[in-house]
Amino acid sequence: MRQLIVIFLSVLTLLSCGNTHKQQVVKGSQSELQYAHNITIEHTKDYVTVRLLNPWKEGSTLHTYYLVKRGTQENVPDDGTKVVVPLQRSVIFTTAHANLVEMLKAPRAIAGVADLRYMIIPDVQRRAHRKGGIVDCGDAMKPDIERIIDLRADAILLSPFENSGGYGRLEQIGIPLIECADYMETSALGRAEWMKFYGLLYGKEHEADSLFTIVEQNYKSLSKQASHSKITRSVLPDRKVGAVWYLPGGESSIGLLYKDAHGRYAYSN
């Protein structure tokens, strides 16, 4: 059972954030992503194109981003969103991504967060209670638009949902919305590999590559250990929002994480 606990701590921290990873970056070349299926990253001389595939509609695109280095005036196609990188002031709606930004050593780029009371990250809580520190932007489902505008943020990182009807006023204030659909990947390592995208956003590409390599090695090692364990435990996640209790599907990244950790998940099928 010790293996199960360790694998949760080592991987869920990054999700809530064998083969050697090799990334070849040349003009017009795509970064090699081994596990993530809902994202492509293409490097060109002038900018980086990041295409997010729509996990709810096969064959369609959820969002396209053109990452342009700060201080340059590159023109980009009009079929996507231009994002100036590295981000210096971002608003983050989820604990998973705020924690990852801290692990990528870019904590000062967190200017605001949503659902502060649930974001149990010591540095975030400390800075949020300091004058001029991180701003609480309210509930993620009903954010304080005025506070977000006042922050003059470079981008907002949030989670998209199927049939959500869009983001309301957030789409009208001129701040790029980064749709963090990593949770829709069908493997834990696929979800974790999105950190390479977030690394590009924060100017921490090398840190993200190094961190992912560590996660990949640890995950495979611990998963192998767990598969030989004679002890299993039943797993029942608890995420209740209002009157709704959300449970991950058995083939979701979290459901497969339970399987790799040698846990028995009631909704695995």
Please tell me what each predicted stretch does:
Residues M1-Q23:
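Bacterial Sec-dependent N-terminal signal peptides
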Residues A106, I173-G174, A261:
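Short, structured coil segments at secondary-structure junctions
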Residues Y246-N269:
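Alpha-helical, coiled-coil/dimerization segments enriched in small aliphatic residues
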